[in-house]
């Protein structure tokens, strides 16, 4: 559930000004980690990302440990970083964490020349990936949802 921008009454500019302040009062339930410019094809990395999305952190680590893919090693590092961020920055317990988002975006492509017959050349694209993993605390989601609803009521009452 996201904060709704009021249609009339409270001005949009005032809403956006207060938005950051209001959102900081909500309990922290998620942490993220991003690995950029990783030298692996996004298509290959997405296959691994799809297997761990929605799983508990322990289950995701087990899946990654037994996967023979190169992307699994990279994903494991990013997941470990997200869990460490959750513990250190927000004090979330590892037992309640699950992988809420895990996605792979395209990074830049390095273009290389591949010599072919008769003096021709083909261009080879070496692809890169940006990998993002977001972990959430299941036990605090209800608390977060209630706080968000209260905040929404507060904003709508100011209209």
From Swiss-Prot:
The protein, known as: Large ribosomal subunit protein uL22
Sorted UniProt keywords: Ribonucleoprotein, Ribosomal protein, RNA-binding, rRNA-binding
GO biological process: translation
Family affiliation: Belongs to the universal ribosomal protein uL22 family.
Ribosomal protein recorded as keyword: yes
Species this protein is from: Thermotoga maritima (strain ATCC 43589 / DSM 3109 / JCM 10099 / NBRC 100826 / MSB8)
Keyword RNA-binding assigned: yes
Disulphide bridges: none
Job description of the protein: This protein binds specifically to 23S rRNA; its binding is stimulated by other ribosomal proteins, e.g. L4, L17, and L20. It is important during the early stages of 50S assembly. It makes multiple contacts with different domains of the 23S rRNA in the assembled 50S subunit and ribosome.
Source organism phylogeny: Bacteria, Thermotogati, Thermotogota, Thermotogae, Thermotogales
């Amino acid at each position: 559930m996201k904060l709704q921008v009021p249609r009339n009454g409270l001005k949009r500019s005032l809403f956006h000004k207060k938005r950051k302040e209001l959102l900081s009062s909500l309990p922290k339930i998620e942490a993220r980690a991003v690995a950029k410019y990783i030298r692996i094809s996004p298509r290959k990395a997405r296959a691994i990302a799809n297997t761990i999305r929605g799983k508990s952190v322990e289950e995701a680590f087990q899946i990654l440990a037994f996967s023979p893919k190169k992307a699994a090693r990279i994903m494991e590092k990013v997941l470990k970083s997200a869990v460490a961020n959750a513990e250190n920055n927000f004090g979330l317990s590892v037992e309640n964490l699950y992988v809420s988002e895990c996605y792979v975006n395209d990074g830049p492509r390095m273009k290389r020349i591949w010599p072919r017959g008769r003096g021709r050349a083909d261009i080879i694209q070496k692809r890169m990936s940006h990998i993002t993993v977001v972990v959430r605390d299941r036990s605090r989601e209800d608390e977060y949802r209630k706080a968000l609803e209260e905040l929404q009521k507060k904003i709508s009452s100011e209209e």
